[in-house]
Swiss-Prot record:
Job of this protein: Phosphorylation of dTMP to form dTDP in both de novo and salvage pathways of dTTP synthesis.
GO cellular component: cytosol
Binding site for ATP: G9, P10, E11, G12, S13, G14, K15, T16
Cited InterPro entries: P-loop_NTPase, Thymidylate_kin-like_dom, Thymidylate_kin_CS, Thymidylate_kinase
Gene (name only): tmk
Gene3D superfamilies linked to this entry: P-loop containing nucleotide triphosphate hydrolases
Family matches, as SUPFAM superfamilies: P-loop containing nucleoside triphosphate hydrolases
Biological source species: Staphylococcus aureus (strain Mu50 / ATCC 700699)
Protein name (Swiss-Prot/TrEMBL): Thymidylate kinase
Any GO BP annotation: dUDP biosynthetic process
Keywords: ATP-binding, Kinase, Nucleotide biosynthesis, Nucleotide-binding, Transferase
EC main group: transferase
Length: 205
């Protein structure tokens, strides 16, 4: 039984922490791997450093680098795992590019979708968990968080509000594969809600 499950959300949604907690619960009963974008494979991790830790760059260059990392990650890690019947939990995927580069950066959602369609070759997630948090709460968490801030963390509040608007538009248009989880709750509640959502999906396939 294979399943491709992605996690999406704005900065400060707690997404990376939630996916880690959910993974450690699922791995007790399922053949599951956890990975991330950009990154997940050596080439992808190098691209991650460029786009998240480097200086400002042309927005289309940024979009193309994310797509290139995505392709390499799919070919080397995600597709082989799915062929082996694994459950793949992925921290970000195509919807991040649509919301961040397509919507918030202003390139255009359909333009970025076309670029990423070439990269993913039709491989959309079976289920996408969207961790729903307001831009204000997300920003507060980023400021309080001890981790180093990347280029996206450092964008202003207006940018993060546009990211959320982008996600809302995507979810409206593709509601069949999205499940929204209230990420304004305490972390343990977010983890539990996310875990139960995934379990319900896996029990049906």
């Amino acid at each position: 039984m294979s399943a491709f499950i992605t996690f999406e959300g704005p900065e400060g949604s707690g997404k990376t922490t939630v996916i880690n907690e959910v993974y450690h619960r699922l791995v007790k009963d399922y053949d599951v791997i956890m990975t991330r974008e950009p990154g997940g494979v050596p080439t992808g991790e190098e691209i991650r450093k460029i786009v998240l830790e480097g200086n400002d760059m042309d927005i289309r260059t940024e979009a193309m680098l994310f797509a290139a990392s995505r392709r390499e990650h799919l070919v080397l890690k995600v597709i082989p795992a799915l062929k082996e019947g694994k459950v793949v939990l992925c921290d970000r995927y195509i919807d991040s590019s649509l919301a961040y580069q397509g919507y918030a950066r202003g390139i255009g959602v359909e333009e970025v979708r076309a670029l990423n369609e070439f990269a993913i070759n039709g491989l959309y997630p079976d289920l996408t968990i969207y961790l729903n948090v307001s831009a204000e709460v997300g920003r507060e968490r980023i400021i309080k968080n001890s981790r180093d801030q990347n280029r996206l963390d450092q964008e202003d509040l207006k940018f993060h509000e546009k990211v959320i608007e982008g996600y809302q538009e995507i979810i409206h248009n593709e509601s069949q594969r999205f499940k929204s989880v209230n990420a304004d709750q305490p972390l343990e509640n977010v983890v539990e809600d996310t875990y139960q959502t995934i379990i319900k999906y896996l029990e049906k396939i």
